[in-house]
A protein has these predicted regions:
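Short acidic, glycine-rich loop/turn motifs
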Residues: 45-52, 63, 213-219, 324-330, ...
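Conserved redox-cofactor binding core of oxidoreductases
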Residues: 20, 50, 87-209, 213-215, ...
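Acidic-histidine catalytic/liganding microenvironments
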Residues: 5, 188-189, 416-417
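FAD-dependent oxidoreductase catalytic-site/capping-region signature
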Residues: 100, 106-157, 162-164, 287, ...
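Cytochrome P450 core scaffold surrounding the K-helix E-X-X-R motif
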Residues: 22-23, 80-88, 204, 374-376, ...
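N-terminal glycine-rich phosphate/pyrophosphate-binding loop and immediately adjacent elements
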Residues: 1-105, 263-266, 274-283
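Glycine-rich loop(s) and the adjacent beta-strand/alpha-helix scaffold that form part
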Residues: 4-11, 16-21, 26, 202, ...
Length: 453
């Protein structure tokens, strides 16, 4: 967007390489991209104090487009109360009414133009094609369990069982930041993109940022900015880069042998991430997406996507995006259920060489408005060293209690008709895990993150 102004010149430094890869473009390829070490930073967190001291996997994209090139493409706004709370806390200009016009301007929504959605923007938003993903049984079960209906989580009713939405273009390709914003601008003479160029620190003249030191091909280089330096490294790399540049908690910087430019204790603090526990249920009948992963069918789906940009590999695997208030006294929802007609461990199978996989449902229970907060520190003054990240997941008792309520509600919904007729044995955490103490112990053992920090 900056390059729309012909009076400015822009240099974009990207630590990773090109995003022009089949598995990035193909929506169902996200199951592979997020695991590919060539496309990510390979971050592992520090031992989590409230998760049995387990380190958490922290996937972040190291490729043009960043994490938007490897993520699940799920499109969903925060609840209006989130933005209004920011404004009430002093972030003027960030209320829901303030940001809604920018959401609308950004979108090219399949829903068309209305009060909540826009058309003609750079980011195409499409519905998940759910006819083969068992959306309707889950939706009806949620309604039968007493929750309100909605057809648009990002619209007037931000609560209930909704059709999931994805950032996918009209040709069935991932609409990442690279595809939607950067690539269309590459023909502009005032924009240069340098790949495999990792920023090391910000350069200063006095107290003013004047450039960036970066590393490319084993060589350390410097570039000077005529106007400004913008950090876009995300939740982990931006604070790391600030601290490497001398901006952060003075005591910590001194311990790492860095000169203090600005003592800013908040840098690297107050990291917020959604806790997520993955439940699994056996399917009572062979109805899950595992059917479509049989080799001959998977090959046909891939070729259909490649030739036409359509079919079952041109979408994602979410059956229903369920947003709930487990306590009606709450001002806004506290739980998201990411319901899928297959587990993420499912793979392409070829009879008779591989055994027919079990049919399973997966349900990610996600705590919204979590209260636990984490932090990030430098391991060393080496810019190529990874940051030390402690998310402090489940530190707050409210988060633990909310997760347990969410697990109980997921159980109730999957045992409510018509979904109940499709649901077999509970596999994770297992029907024998019933008390709050037992559920909390399971949460500490298996809880991961929503990758939304």
């Amino acid at each position: 967007r900056l390059s729309e102004d012909p009076n400015v010149s822009i240099l974009l430094l990207e630590a990773g390489g090109t995003d022009r890869k089949f598995k990035i473009s193909m929506p169902l390829g996200f199951l592979s991209t997020i695991l590919d070490p060539k496309l990510g930073w390979g971050y592992m967190g520090e031992p989590e104090p409230h998760l049995n001291h387990r380190p958490l996997w922290l996937p972040r994209g190291k490729v043009l487009g960043g994490s938007s090139s490897i993520n699940g493409m799920f499109y969903m706004r925060g609840h209006p109360n989130d933005y209004d709370t920011w404004a009430q806390m002093g972030a003027r200009g960030w209320s829901y009414d303030d940001v809604l016009p920018y959401f609308r301007k950004m979108e090219d929504s399949w829903r068309g133009e209305n009060h909540y959605h826009g058309t003609g923007g750079p980011l195409r938003v499409e519905p998940i094609q759910t006819r083969h993903l068992l959306h309707e049984p889950l939706k009806q079960a949620v309604l039968a369990a007493g929750y309100p209906d909605t057809d648009d989580i990002s619209g007037a009713q931000a609560e209930g069982p909704a059709l999931g939405e994805l950032t996918i273009d009209r040709n069935g390709r991932r609409a990442s930041a690279a595809a939607a914003y950067i690539r269309p601008a590459l023909g502009r003479r005032n924009l240069e993109v340098r790949l495999e160029s990792q920023a090391r620190r910000v350069l200063f003249d006095g107290q003013r940022a004047r450039g960036v030191e970066y590393q490319r091909g084993g060589q350390v280089r410097q570039v000077r900015a005529r106007r400004e330096v913008i950090l876009g490294g995300g939740v982990y790399n931006s604070p790391q880069l600030l601290m490497l540049s001398g901006i952060g908690p003075a005591e910590h910087l001194t311990e790492r042998g860095l000169s203090v430019k600005v003592d800013s204790p908040g840098v690297g603090r107050n990291i917020s991430e959604h806790p997520c526990c993955m439940m699994e249920f056996a399917a009572a009948r062979p109805v899950t997406f595992v059917r479509e992963l049989r080799f001959d069918r998977a090959a046909r789906h891939f070729l259909q996507w490649l030739a036409l940009g359509t079919g079952k590999f041109a979408t994602q695997l979410n059956s229903c995006n369920i947003i709930l208030r487990t306590d009606r006294k709450l001002a806004q929802p506290d739980i998201q259920l990411m319901s899928n007609p297959v587990t993420f461990s499912a793979k392409v199978w070829m009879p008779p060489f591989t055994k027919t996989p079990e049919h399973k449902f997966a349900c990610g229970v996600v705590v919204l408005n979590q209260r636990s907060r984490g932090w990030l520190e430098l391991r060393s003054a080496d810019p190529l060293d990874t940051p030390a990240v402690t998310l402090n997941i489940m530190d707050d008792e409210w988060d633990r209690a909310t997760m347990i309520r969410g697990i109980r509600e997921a159980r109730r919904i999957y045992r409510t008709s018509p979904q109940a007729e499709l649901t077999g044995t509970e596999l994770l955490p297992g029907a024998e895990v019933q008390s709050d103490d037992e559920l909390e112990a399971w949460v500490r053992e298996v809880c991961e993150i929503g990758q939304h920090a």
